């Protein structure tokens, strides 16, 4: 366990990382963390980050830039409670519509999903472009946050027009093809898209 002084600094750094991800959707740089907590030396901040990694309070993918995140243990350390999976709005499954980024509600993490709540978000589907694989209008899809995908995976993607849509993803020689699972609809082609995540589960509200 850290000393009382170190514990205070650990909490400051964890809070800085957590707040940046909550506010901006991505973690801060080492320099930004230092500025936030009053440390001018980047090497000192880096040393603290190594200690937090070793303690399991933060995690990162060494093969990718800016993948720092606060773990469940880290959130417990700073007193942040998990509410569940955030429901962040509506995504198009047909003609794309602008995604709503504010959190509308929270949904409990299903027991059979091997992910933490902070790795996921939910979106409500509008349209019928994915009906062949059982994603229907009004369904709520559970999405694992990640910025890449393999060909054939079902993704939530943001197009160049800043509109979000759920489609089957294919990276091709001349760009990206988003394939609807509906025989009456055509494929969509883009030079590039931003992947928000891959669909890992689905919830269908019960009819009353």
UniProtKB/Swiss-Prot annotation:
It catalyses: Hydrolysis of Ala-|-Gly bond in repressor LexA. Represses a number of genes involved in the response to DNA damage (SOS response), including recA and lexA. In the presence of single-stranded DNA, RecA interacts with LexA causing an autocatalytic cleavage which disrupts the DNA-binding part of LexA, leading to derepression of the SOS regulon and eventually DNA repair. Residues 30-50 bind DNA. Its EC number is 3.4.21.88. It comes from the Bacteria. Belongs to the peptidase S24 family. Gene3D superfamilies: Umud Fragment, subunit A, Winged helix-like DNA-binding domain superfamily/Winged helix DNA-binding domain. GO terms for biological process: DNA repair; DNA replication; negative regulation of DNA-templated transcription; proteolysis; SOS response. Keywords: Autocatalytic cleavage, DNA damage, DNA repair, DNA replication, DNA-binding, Hydrolase, Repressor, SOS response, Transcription, Transcription regulation. Transmembrane segments: none annotated. This is LexA repressor. The record marks 93-94 as: Cleavage. It comes from Lacticaseibacillus paracasei (strain ATCC 334 / BCRC 17002 / CCUG 31169 / CIP 107868 / KCTC 3260 / NRRL B-441) (Lactobacillus paracasei). InterPro entries: LexA, LexA-like, LexA/Signal_pep-like_sf, LexA_DNA-bd_dom, LexA_repressor, Peptidase_S24_LexA, Peptidase_S24_S26A/B/C, WH-like_DNA-bd_sf. Homodimer. GO terms for molecular function: DNA binding; serine-type endopeptidase activity. NCBIfam families: lexA. The active site is at 129 (for autocatalytic cleavage activity), 167 (for autocatalytic cleavage activity).
